[in-house]
Amino acid sequence: MKASRTHWSIDLIGGCFGIAIALGLVRFDFGIIGNLMADAQWIDVEDIGTLAAINMLGYLTGCIQQATVKSRATSIRYVQIAMITIIASIVLEGRSTNLPSQSVLRLLCGWGAAHVVSGLPTLALERVPQRWRRKATGLIMSGGGIGSLLGAVGIGFFAPTSAPSAWNVLATLTVVLSLPTLALLRQRKQLTAPASETLANSTNQTISNFNKSKINKLILIIILGFALMQIGQIPVILYEPLIAVNKIGLTPMMASNIDSLFGIGLIIGGLIPSIVPSKLTTSLFLAVIAAVGLAGMILFGISNHLITLSISIFLIGVWDMMTGTLTLDRLGQLCNEDTQRRAWSTATTIGAMGFIAFSSTTSQLAQHNVNLILAMGITAVSAQLILEIFQHRLSAKQQNSR
């Protein structure tokens, strides 16, 4: 096996761009393009939620697969196949003008995105020193915002009213962003897994000082908090363009440009943990950002003006990405890299199950009772805040017992 001569910071680019594709382009930008497909009469408005649920069904399948993979080499192979699947699916989606073909491609795209989101971050973090882990995690996960922003701005400028052109924009971005990610995966195939002695020692010390059952309970609470965040964001991801056009009266182009604020929020949400001193613990950070997310969701629900809508979308983007970044980092503090990958995959699996149930249940309400969808989203985020407060208190007990 070869040893890599590149600095570990190069790995973060491949990780960041992979997340940009899997989260930003595949998931976050679908609300924009789904609305354009409905305008083009490829699908009905109600089908946006249905396709999102199908996408998450594929996502769920991929998450379950990644969570059960024990071999590092197998995980890398799955992520490579997933990247190729995503590229092919997005290219073909721009040429599929009916619901059945879109359903198949959304399913495949979701499967691929799951393997990238679940398996890629830990691969990109393998060579990162422990003291840089939270910063590096933030940089990688900010890719979700970069992808969302690039997609929203690209569609807004080049294809504000054309579904085929919008898909072409996403396909071009996907191909370009995939190059560093595929290079990272090729490199990882040639390298042995680094021994994370510092992380292992830290984890063993934590478990010895704070019994294993309580650690497992803490991990479960963190996973459920992340899952509730994924459920709570659905009204914004799927129905922001619909609300912006029908409730506030914006044009489709303005709605797409407003959605770019979500991407900016995602980028900032990924970067904030990278610059905030470690004295602000990850467990406390999770509770604080859950409160920000709840404020953003409430503001989104009562928005009747462009300014309040813009602020709410930005806050929700920050909350979304910070929750993902901090959850991944916190899991890494509690367990080794392999267990972290599987715990992270489990978190995304449960979130995907909730996303499927929520989006499929609410798809019929989109046209006539969107306020009920918003209320359900706010309820989910309120539950997340309660869980994050609880996990912080449990983490504080852990620290006191050391």
Features from the language model and the residues they span:
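Pair of pore-lining "gating" transmembrane helices in MFS-fold secondary transporters
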Residues: 7-32, 216-232, 314, 318
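Extracytoplasmic gate region of multi-pass secondary transporters
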Residues: 30-31, 219-259
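Helix-to-loop junctions at the C-terminal end of transmembrane segments
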Residues: 62-74, 269-281, 366
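Structural signature of the two symmetry-related core transmembrane helices
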Residues: 77-91, 284-298
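Paired small-residue
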Residues: 100-108, 307-315
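Cytoplasmic helix-loop-helix junction between adjacent transmembrane helices
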Residues: 105-143
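Helix-loop-helix hairpin linking two adjacent transmembrane segments in secondary transporters
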Residues: 132, 138-186
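A late C-terminal transmembrane helix in Major Facilitator Superfamily
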Residues: 337-369
